[in-house]
Amino acid sequence: MAVVIAVVAGLAGCSSTGGKRAEEAREQGASGKANVTTPRWKVAMVTHSGDGDTYWDIVQSGAKQAAAKDNIEFLYSHDKEAGRQAQLVQAAIDKKVDGLIVTLAKPSAMKKVVKKAVKAGIPVITINSGQEESKDFGALTHIGQDEVLAGEAVGRELNDRGKKKAICLLHEQGNVGHEQRCEGIKKTFDGKVEDLYVEGTNMPGVQSSVEAKLQSDKKVDTVVTLGAPFAATAAEAKKDAGSKAEVDTFDLNAKVASGLKDGTIGFAVDQQPYMQGYESVDLLWLYRYNRDMLGGGKPVLTGPQILTKKDAGKLEELTKRGTR
């Protein structure tokens, strides 16, 4: 079972915003000048991430920043297999955490244990995936992007670029959010979209599958990947296939920022993972301290944001810092 646990300790100033104030708070914490007088609450984040997915490094970066500011002990664990993810949530319940952040990529497997956490009096916030199920499961709110709307934004961008046939590369079967992204593209794209399923933990296999598809279907002029780590792989497959198809992607990392700059990637759809991590921890602190909550019963949206070559310069700097 793949389990990663990280603990972040820190004392810092009270603020529900990031940026300069958060940096100042972290500096205060390092020097022992804490403004937060709340108890040292323990917050657990349990995600569906597989090993080596850099997206979740960025989420953790935001969560750790907020934890340092809010005097929170932050625990992180993950497993791509839904049953084992549910077991990790149960482990957090057993630890009597003061708050729980969880993803619902495969909601049916998570429903029982999330409701159990709520029944135990643990405030829950869902992030990234599970927007439609979040409220029903008893979560306070959901933080992330509306995946259908994000897909629709991609479809419109492809229309603007004059594209006619796209592959939607699904790297995790059963992930509801990924399926919604492809559905959204199909809603607004005037051309044709074909789903291509690959095993996301096998990058050589991903590259071979994309290359074979591009070689067999010369009408494909776009490959849309659903995660930043797969964009560079798709670009290599395109090169080896001798294809002129454009590679576009959901999410952002350093390689994607570099690809936007050199033209190997056309555009990226960013859902701001740093913000998902930061705001989820900060909102749990606000809720426990003052019963505050954002969204008014609606999801707190962090995306989508279309990023192109014109954004690449600044993005390269931020991705190297680990916050975009």
For the regions a protein language model found, what residue spans apply to each?
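C-terminal motif of bacterial Sec signal peptides marking the signal peptidase cleavage site
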Residues: A9-G13
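Bacterial signal peptide processing site
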Residues: S15-G18
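Hinge/cleft segment of the Venus flytrap/periplasmic-binding protein
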Residues: E23-E24, Q28-P39, T188-F189, E279-R324
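Extracytoplasmic "Venus flytrap"
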Residues: R26-A66, D70, L75-Q87, L104-P107, ...
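Structural motif
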Residues: E73-K96, D195-D217, A231-T233
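Hydrophobic alpha-helical segments within soluble ligand-binding/sensing domains
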Residues: Q85, T141-A166, P204-Q207, L252-V256, ...
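Hydrophobic alpha-helical
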Residues: V102-K119, I185, G200-S258
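Flexible loop/hinge segments that line or gate small-molecule binding clefts
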Residues: S108-L149, N253-K261, I265-G266, E316
